[in-house]
Amino acid sequence: MNDRELMFLPAHEQKRLIVEKVISSVEMVEASYRRIAELEPQLNAFITLDEDGAMSAARSADAQLAQGKNPGVLHGVPIAVKDLEVTKGLRTTLGSTFFKNWIPDYDSVAVQRIRATGAVIIGKTNTPEFGNREETFTDIAATCNNPWDPTRMPGGSSGGTASAIAAGMCSIGTGSDGGGSVRLPASFCGIFGHKPTHGRIPRYGGQAKPAYNSAGTSGPMSNDVRDSAILNQALSGFDDRDPGSIKGAVPDYLIDLENGIDGMRIGTTMTLGISDVNDDVATAVEDSWFAFSELGANVENLAIAFDPMPREAWWTLWTAGQEAMYGHLADERPEDLMPYTLEMIEHGRTLSGADVSVALRNVQNLQLQLHQVFQEYDLILAPTNAAVAWPHLQPPEKIGSEINQDDMAGINYGAIPFTMVFNSSFNPASSIPCGFGEGGMPVGLQIIGGYDDDATVLRASRAFEQARPWSGDRPPVS
C-alpha cells in the first residue's frame, strides 16, 4: 500500500493496521509527512508542522503496543489540529501576527482529549485570523488553497484542516465552528464535518476566550463519518473550566451508527426561508434527498420562516465578542490586525448593552422556533452553502436571483447563509458531500438535528454515506 492509499484510509482502519502491527505508527506518520512534503507547496494547509514531536509521539505509541498496553481509539493515527486550539509546547498563532511566536504551556481541553486517544498531532492547520472569515487567508501564512482547484478558496475558517484531509495528507483533523467554520470548508472541499451540540465539547483553550460566545465549538472533520463519530465521542464531556459545557453522561454516538434511518421524519428546505441558492447547488442537494426516502425515511418539504431573521443577532454577538476578546490589540497595534478583524472590532464598539440584550433575546426566540420544528421532525436537510467554492477573493456577484451580500466585514453572507443559524440555536449539524457543481467543485448537504441529538445526525450521515458513497472521489491535487 503506497502513501496515498494509506492516507485515504479511514482513521479507524489506520488504527486497526497499527494495533495489528501490519504497520507501525512511525511508518504511518512518516507516510503522512511525505504526503505533506509533496502537496503542501500547492495547498498551504498548515501554519506549523511538528515532525520531531510527532515522530516522538509515534515511537511512544509503538512502544505502548509492544508493552501490551491498551490502545486508544485513534492510537498512533496522524491527526491535524486547527491553529485555534492551544497546544502545549507547539506554536499556536490563532492565525494572527500578534501570536506568531506564542508557544503555550498548556493544552486546550480538546487537545488534551486528542492526546488521550493516542492520536499523533502532526501540525497546526491554516486559519484566518481568530477564525474570522469564510476564506482562509491571513498575514501569518500563505493563502490556503482548495485541492479540487488551487485557484479557489477551501472555505474557512477551518480551511487548512479541510484542505489537508481532502488532499490525503491525513485522514482526520479538528476544526472549530462559530458560524459554519467546520461545515463550510467541509462542503467546499468535499469531506465530512460535524458541528456538535454546543457545550458537548468544552471550549477551554480553544476558540472561545473568557467572554460571552454563543457561537463557537470545536468539531471533527474527516473523510469518513465513523471517524468523526469516534472523535466527537472522545472530545465530548463536561469540564469545569468551561461552565457552559454539558454535565452528565455523554450519549453513545457509535452504538446506533449503523442502524439506518427507516421511519425517521425528515423535513427538507432549499432556502431555510433565508436565501436563494445557485442552480448547481440546488440540483445536487435536491437529488440527495431521494436517498433518504429510499432508505425508508418519511421525507417532506419543510416550510420555515424565522422571525426575526437570525443573521443580525449572530453578527451582533460575534462582533461584540471580537471586541471583548481582541479589542485591546486594536488599541495597541491596529496595523497588525487583518482588516476584517479590525472591522469586526470596530463594529463591536458601536454596540450598546441594549443591542446585545436584544440579540440574546432573539437567539432565545430562534432556539424556541427550532425546538418546535424538532417536535415534528427528527432531522432537517438543507444546503450547506448557496454556492460552490469560488476563486480567491472573487465571490459570486449573484446567488440565484439575488445580489450577494458582503457587508459583514467582507464575509460573503449571501453565499453562506445557512450555517450560522445553527450556531446561534446550538443544534448539531453536519455537512456531507452530495455531488458536484460548477467547475467540478463539491457540493455539501447539511444535516441538522434537534438539540443534543448528535447521534441521529451522525447516524443519518452514515446512512447517506453508504447509500451515496463519496469518499472514493479524489481531487486533482491529491
Model-derived regions, located:
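An N-terminal boundary/leader segment
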Residues: 1-55, 294-296, 473-478
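Acyltransferase
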Residues: 22, 27-30, 59-62, 252-255, ...
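Short glycine/serine-rich loop/turn segments
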Residues: 74-218, 222, 243, 271, ...
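Short, well-ordered beta-strand elements within core beta-sheets of diverse protein domains
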Residues: 14-20, 99-103, 216-223, 346-351, ...
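Short helix-loop capping/hinge segments that flank enzyme active sites or metal/cofactor-binding pockets
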Residues: 74-94, 255-270, 317-371, 384-388, ...
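Long amphipathic alpha-helix in the N-terminal Rossmann-like dinucleotide-binding domain
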Residues: 52-62, 117-119, 128
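Structural helix-boundary/capping segments
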Residues: 38, 116, 166-269, 275, ...
